[in-house]
Amino acid sequence: MSTGLQLLGTTLGTLGWLGIIISCAIPLWRVTAFIGNNIVTAQTMWEGLWMSCVVQSTGQMQCKVYDSMLALAQDLQASRAILVISAIVGLIAMFASFAGGKCTNCLADNSAKALVATTGGVAFIIAGILGLVPPSWTANTIIRDFYNPLVAEAQKREFGAAIFICWGAAVLLVIGGGLLCSSYPKGRTSSRGRYTPASQNGRERSEYV
């Protein structure tokens, strides 16, 4: 297994996991869309998965945690659950990739290390795929509402920074997991496949003749 490839995959996966945590925490999934008469508004709305914030033109910001989960939009409810699962799977992947690292002493057997590291890579990929769902779903909802004439201009939103952070984090998770999986040694010859005892028996028989 290539140590450099494994370290690169673990590093990218860890950065992706941190990106998932950041995007899940910051209240920047949806921001006020400045269109029409809204361009002179004195405040900006930020909406996240756990809270919403109002930023005044003076720079003062007030945030409030959502009182009821059922009052949230469907995409935000699902994004909460999916990103939490993605973060948990990513954490498991990090532990597995560290334990299976060639530069660590958690496992003595190299074959076991390779298997554990590859398992971590698969977990990183799963976490990345899960991480792609919430920003894509939210982005689709924002675009649909933005071009919906029945939605008031004051209620229309644009993409927040958290959506782009989550997309980037998910890509890093998938790439990191792919590197860990590709670093698994292929075509190894097991010592059990050697026929040394048979050749020794053949030499012994020739001596008796």
Swiss-Prot record:
GO terms for cellular component: bicellular tight junction; plasma membrane. One of its GO terms (molecular function) is identical protein binding. This is Claudin-like protein ZF-A9. The chain crosses the membrane at residues 8-28, 81-101, 114-134, 159-179. InterPro entries: Claudin, Claudin_CS, PMP22/EMP/MP20/Claudin. Component of tight junction (TJ) strands. Keywords: Cell junction, Cell membrane, Membrane, Tight junction, Transmembrane, Transmembrane helix. The lineage of its organism: Eukaryota, Metazoa, Chordata, Craniata, Vertebrata. Coiled coil: none annotated. Residues 188-201 have a biased composition (Polar residues). Belongs to the claudin family. It comes from Danio rerio. It is a multi-pass membrane protein. Residues 187-209 are annotated as: Disordered. GO terms for biological process: bicellular tight junction assembly; calcium-independent cell-cell adhesion via plasma membrane cell-adhesion molecules; cell adhesion. It is found in: Cell membrane; Cell junction, Tight junction. It comes from the Eukaryota.
